[in-house]
């Protein structure tokens, strides 16, 4: 009897009770997909004849340029503000990161120099050095030389620490004395100097002076015999007997121990033995002489000196030494750290200005607009669908639940009637 009652239930009543919740769940679950499809499709306008059908293309493809502008304004107005860009720049430009980047660049440059087969680096360095000595340094020296205190401290320091304490050693004094007696004043030179000195006029002056300024026994000898004949005979002897005269002069130098006396005099020669006033005046004269020379001829001297140097060969030598220098390799980290600290101090003061200047240059808003406009509606739809499925699945599920509840509510209303 019960089975007959169940089978006799009206199928329309069952469908009225069951279908609304099921239909509501289906509609609620797929509403998001339908809404997204309605926003993007159709992708292109549909024409019948020359007339475009309403609502074609979809809402977003039809207003993609305006959407791009809105996206750009939203991002630049709330996300990528100047303050946020400053924070981003500070995070990117932390000292450790900057140090690592600089160290990487320095190591890369060092590897490039080591692998340079055509000596390009040497040519660049030679050009820099040549310009430095031929143009830049002479101009700088010319400008600095106009100052009255130019090189004053340096010259005084050299004078006080080197020249004032300079003193010949025994070996140096011996070599200097030998050079003077053998190279500068040998017997032949002394003999010729004696001949040149004993002219007729000089002999007459000497003879008259001896006659007038002597007294006593010397006056008698000078006036009776005179020195004129003696000097004339000495001059004739030096002219006629050159070898003998040279030998006699050499013997005189040996007997007088001129070499030893000259060596002792050279060893005792020192500026410290001079009076303090004389030393001060000598230091002042030395400084003024050097300054005057630099002012008048320093520029030309440096230019001429630069022309005598093979800068390319010197550059190759410098680079080869740097390539094999262990100190350079170990100092790269220190250099990068110091440069990073310098950059950090600079950014602390001017980061706001730099960011303000960089924003118009980067044109981030234009980049956003161009990227949105360049993205096809299909790709935009796929991106939105991907976000919904991966990040907003709970909303989709909630839509299905709400649709089911609405269907149940409709069923209850129907039953209450």
Curated annotation (Swiss-Prot):
InterPro entries: DUF445 (IPR007383), UCP032178 (IPR016991). Keywords: Cell inner membrane, Cell membrane, Membrane, Transmembrane, Transmembrane helix. Pfam families: DUF445 (PF04286). Its main location: membrane. One of its GO terms (cellular component) is plasma membrane. This is UPF0754 membrane protein cce_2569. Belongs to the UPF0754 family. It is found in: Cell inner membrane. The chain crosses the membrane at residues 395-415. It is a single-pass membrane protein. It comes from Crocosphaera subtropica (strain ATCC 51142 / BH68) (Cyanothece sp. (strain ATCC 51142)). The keyword Signal does not apply.
